Protein backbone atom coordinates (compact mmCIF):
# COMPACT_ATOMS: atom_id res chain seq x y z
CA UNK A 1 0.00 0.00 0.00
CA UNK A 2 1.42 3.37 -0.93
CA UNK A 3 1.45 6.33 1.41
CA UNK A 4 -1.46 7.99 -0.38
CA UNK A 5 -3.76 5.03 0.17
CA UNK A 6 -2.64 4.79 3.78
CA UNK A 7 -3.50 8.46 4.31
CA UNK A 8 -6.93 7.95 2.73
CA UNK A 9 -7.56 4.96 4.97
CA UNK A 10 -6.57 6.97 8.06
CA UNK A 11 -8.85 9.79 6.93
CA UNK A 12 -11.68 7.30 6.55
CA UNK A 13 -11.02 5.83 10.00
CA UNK A 14 -10.80 9.25 11.61
CA UNK A 15 -14.18 10.17 10.12
CA UNK A 16 -15.59 6.92 11.56
CA UNK A 17 -14.59 7.80 15.14
CA UNK A 18 -17.67 7.77 17.35
CA UNK A 19 -16.43 9.81 20.33
CA UNK A 20 -17.74 9.09 23.80
CA UNK A 21 -16.20 6.25 25.76
CA UNK A 22 -14.43 4.92 22.67
CA UNK A 23 -12.48 7.74 21.08
CA UNK A 24 -12.21 5.73 17.87
CA UNK A 25 -13.78 2.48 16.79
CA UNK A 26 -10.39 1.05 15.89
CA UNK A 27 -6.77 1.30 16.99
CA UNK A 28 -4.14 0.92 14.26
CA UNK A 29 -1.38 -1.43 15.39
CA UNK A 30 1.92 -2.19 13.68
CA UNK A 31 4.04 -5.35 13.87
CA UNK A 32 7.82 -5.78 13.58
CA UNK A 33 8.97 -2.24 14.34
CA UNK A 34 10.12 -1.19 10.88
CA UNK A 35 11.57 2.29 10.44
CA UNK A 36 8.68 3.20 8.13
CA UNK A 37 6.46 2.92 11.22
CA UNK A 38 8.32 5.95 12.53
CA UNK A 39 8.92 7.80 9.26
CA UNK A 40 5.53 7.31 7.60
CA UNK A 41 2.86 5.72 9.77
CA UNK A 42 3.24 7.73 12.97
CA UNK A 43 3.14 11.17 11.28
CA UNK A 44 0.02 10.20 9.31
CA UNK A 45 -1.70 8.85 12.41
CA UNK A 46 -0.84 12.04 14.26
CA UNK A 47 -2.18 14.14 11.38
CA UNK A 48 -5.59 12.48 11.68
CA UNK A 49 -5.60 12.22 15.47
CA UNK A 50 -5.54 8.42 15.43
CA UNK A 51 -4.01 6.32 18.20
CA UNK A 52 -1.60 3.47 17.49
CA UNK A 53 0.18 0.51 19.05
CA UNK A 54 3.65 -0.40 17.77
CA UNK A 55 4.78 -3.98 18.45
CA UNK A 56 8.55 -4.45 18.54
CA UNK A 57 10.73 -7.57 18.22
CA UNK A 58 13.34 -6.45 20.73
CA UNK A 59 16.30 -8.52 19.47
CA UNK A 60 15.96 -6.67 16.15
CA UNK A 61 16.02 -3.12 17.52
CA UNK A 62 18.43 -1.05 15.42
CA UNK A 63 18.99 -3.98 13.05
CA UNK A 64 17.10 -5.20 9.98
CA UNK A 65 14.92 -8.00 8.63
CA UNK A 66 15.61 -9.67 5.29
CA UNK A 67 12.29 -10.39 3.58
CA UNK A 68 11.62 -13.46 1.39
CA UNK A 69 11.68 -11.11 -1.61
CA UNK A 70 15.22 -10.08 -0.74
CA UNK A 71 14.37 -6.65 0.64
CA UNK A 72 16.20 -5.22 3.63
CA UNK A 73 13.76 -3.76 6.17
CA UNK A 74 15.39 -1.55 8.78
CA UNK A 75 14.05 -1.72 12.33
CA UNK A 76 13.59 1.30 14.58
CA UNK A 77 16.26 2.37 17.04
CA UNK A 78 15.75 2.76 20.77
CA UNK A 79 15.53 6.52 20.30
CA UNK A 80 12.75 6.16 17.73
CA UNK A 81 10.77 3.81 19.96
CA UNK A 82 11.16 6.21 22.88
CA UNK A 83 10.01 9.12 20.73
CA UNK A 84 6.88 7.24 19.61
CA UNK A 85 6.03 6.56 23.24
CA UNK A 86 6.61 10.19 24.20
CA UNK A 87 4.32 11.21 21.33
CA UNK A 88 1.48 9.27 22.95
CA UNK A 89 1.60 6.04 20.96
CA UNK A 90 1.56 2.70 22.78
CA UNK A 91 4.51 0.32 22.57
CA UNK A 92 4.01 -3.45 22.75
CA UNK A 93 6.08 -6.60 22.45
CA UNK A 94 6.32 -8.72 19.31
CA UNK A 95 8.50 -11.27 21.09
CA UNK A 96 12.25 -11.00 21.48
CA UNK A 97 13.65 -12.85 18.46
CA UNK A 98 10.52 -12.88 16.25
CA UNK A 99 10.35 -16.67 16.58
CA UNK A 100 7.38 -19.01 16.77
CA UNK A 101 6.41 -18.96 20.45
CA UNK A 102 4.44 -22.19 20.08
CA UNK A 103 7.65 -24.06 19.18
CA UNK A 104 9.61 -22.97 22.25
CA UNK A 105 10.18 -25.03 25.38
CA UNK A 106 8.36 -23.57 28.36
CA UNK A 107 11.47 -22.12 30.01
CA UNK A 108 12.65 -20.43 26.80
CA UNK A 109 9.15 -19.14 26.12
CA UNK A 110 8.92 -17.49 29.53
CA UNK A 111 12.41 -16.02 29.23
CA UNK A 112 11.77 -14.60 25.75
CA UNK A 113 8.51 -12.94 26.76
CA UNK A 114 9.91 -11.46 29.96
CA UNK A 115 13.08 -10.27 28.21
CA UNK A 116 11.17 -8.46 25.49
CA UNK A 117 8.93 -6.76 28.04
CA UNK A 118 11.86 -5.74 30.26
CA UNK A 119 13.80 -4.26 27.32
CA UNK A 120 10.84 -2.19 26.13
CA UNK A 121 10.01 -0.95 29.62
CA UNK A 122 13.64 0.09 30.05
CA UNK A 123 13.49 2.04 26.78
CA UNK A 124 10.23 3.90 27.32
CA UNK A 125 10.09 4.06 31.12
CA UNK A 126 6.50 2.80 31.15
CA UNK A 127 4.71 -0.49 31.69
CA UNK A 128 4.32 -2.66 28.58
CA UNK A 129 1.18 -4.76 28.80
CA UNK A 130 0.36 -5.64 25.18
CA UNK A 131 1.77 -8.41 23.02
CA UNK A 132 1.41 -9.34 19.36
CA UNK A 133 2.16 -13.02 18.73
CA UNK A 134 4.87 -13.44 16.06
CA UNK A 135 3.29 -14.91 12.92
CA UNK A 136 -0.04 -14.71 14.78
CA UNK A 137 0.54 -18.19 16.24
CA UNK A 138 -0.52 -19.08 19.76
CA UNK A 139 -1.87 -21.87 21.93
CA UNK A 140 -3.13 -22.03 25.51
CA UNK A 141 0.41 -22.62 26.80
CA UNK A 142 1.64 -19.47 25.06
CA UNK A 143 -1.36 -17.51 26.35
CA UNK A 144 -0.65 -18.64 29.92
CA UNK A 145 3.03 -17.73 29.59
CA UNK A 146 2.15 -14.30 28.19
CA UNK A 147 -0.20 -13.63 31.06
CA UNK A 148 2.43 -14.75 33.59
CA UNK A 149 5.00 -12.47 31.91
CA UNK A 150 2.74 -9.50 32.64
CA UNK A 151 0.80 -9.01 29.42
CA UNK A 152 -2.89 -8.20 29.80
CA UNK A 153 -3.84 -8.03 26.11
CA UNK A 154 -2.47 -10.02 23.18
CA UNK A 155 -3.16 -9.88 19.46
CA UNK A 156 -3.25 -12.75 16.97
CA UNK A 157 -4.14 -12.61 13.27
CA UNK A 158 -7.04 -15.02 13.27
CA UNK A 159 -9.07 -15.72 16.36
CA UNK A 160 -9.87 -19.00 18.01
CA UNK A 161 -11.34 -20.55 21.11
CA UNK A 162 -9.54 -19.26 24.18
CA UNK A 163 -10.46 -19.07 27.85
CA UNK A 164 -9.50 -15.37 27.86
CA UNK A 165 -10.54 -13.49 24.69
CA UNK A 166 -8.42 -10.49 25.72
CA UNK A 167 -5.36 -12.65 25.09
CA UNK A 168 -6.33 -13.71 21.55
CA UNK A 169 -7.71 -10.61 19.86
CA UNK A 170 -8.25 -11.50 16.16
CA UNK A 171 -7.17 -9.46 13.16
CA UNK A 172 -8.68 -9.68 9.69
CA UNK A 173 -6.35 -9.07 6.69
CA UNK A 174 -7.31 -6.47 4.10
CA UNK A 175 -4.73 -6.16 1.34
CA UNK A 176 -3.93 -2.60 0.30
CA UNK A 177 -2.88 -3.91 -3.10
CA UNK A 178 -6.49 -4.57 -4.04
CA UNK A 179 -8.68 -1.85 -5.43
CA UNK A 180 -11.44 -2.91 -3.04
CA UNK A 181 -9.40 -2.28 0.13
CA UNK A 182 -11.50 0.74 1.16
CA UNK A 183 -14.76 -1.10 0.56
CA UNK A 184 -13.53 -3.98 2.70
CA UNK A 185 -12.53 -1.54 5.41
CA UNK A 186 -16.01 -0.01 5.29
CA UNK A 187 -17.68 -3.41 5.69
CA UNK A 188 -15.31 -4.27 8.52
CA UNK A 189 -16.06 -1.04 10.34
CA UNK A 190 -19.77 -1.85 10.30
CA UNK A 191 -19.05 -5.26 11.83
CA UNK A 192 -16.38 -3.90 14.21
CA UNK A 193 -13.62 -6.47 13.62
CA UNK A 194 -9.97 -5.77 12.96
CA UNK A 195 -8.66 -4.59 9.61
CA UNK A 196 -5.12 -5.14 8.40
CA UNK A 197 -3.47 -2.91 5.82
CA UNK A 198 -0.02 -3.11 4.26
CA UNK A 199 2.19 -0.07 3.69
CA UNK A 200 5.14 -1.48 1.77
CA UNK A 201 6.06 -4.24 4.25
CA UNK A 202 4.49 -2.35 7.11
CA UNK A 203 1.62 -4.27 8.69
CA UNK A 204 -1.13 -2.02 9.91
CA UNK A 205 -3.68 -3.72 12.09
CA UNK A 206 -6.80 -2.16 13.44
CA UNK A 207 -8.66 -3.44 16.43
CA UNK A 208 -11.59 -2.22 18.52
CA UNK A 209 -10.24 -0.96 21.87
CA UNK A 210 -13.52 -1.13 23.75
CA UNK A 211 -15.25 -3.92 25.65
CA UNK A 212 -12.18 -6.18 25.56
Identify the residue ranges that each predicted region occupies.
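Histidine/lysine/aspartate-rich catalytic loop segments that bind and position anionic ligands
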Residues: 76-111
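Glycine-enriched alpha-helix->loop->beta-strand junction motifs that scaffold or abut catalytic
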Residues: 48-51, 87-91, 147-153
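C-terminal active-site subregion of NodB/CE4 polysaccharide deacetylases
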Residues: 1-29, 34-40, 103-212
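Active-site beta->alpha N-cap acidic-glycine motif
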Residues: 1-87
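Active-site-proximal loop/turn and secondary-structure-junction residues that shape catalytic pockets
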Residues: 58-60, 95-97, 137, 160
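Conserved SAM-binding loop
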Residues: 50, 54, 97-101, 121
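Residue-level signal for pocket-adjacent positions within structured domains
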Residues: 56, 71, 96, 164-167
Amino acid sequence: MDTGKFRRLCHFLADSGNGGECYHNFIPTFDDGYVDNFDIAAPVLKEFGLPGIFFISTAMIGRHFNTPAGNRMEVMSRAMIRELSMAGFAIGSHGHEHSYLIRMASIELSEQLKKSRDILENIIGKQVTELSYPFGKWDERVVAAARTAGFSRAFAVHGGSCMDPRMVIPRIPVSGERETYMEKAAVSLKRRPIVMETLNFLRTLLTPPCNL
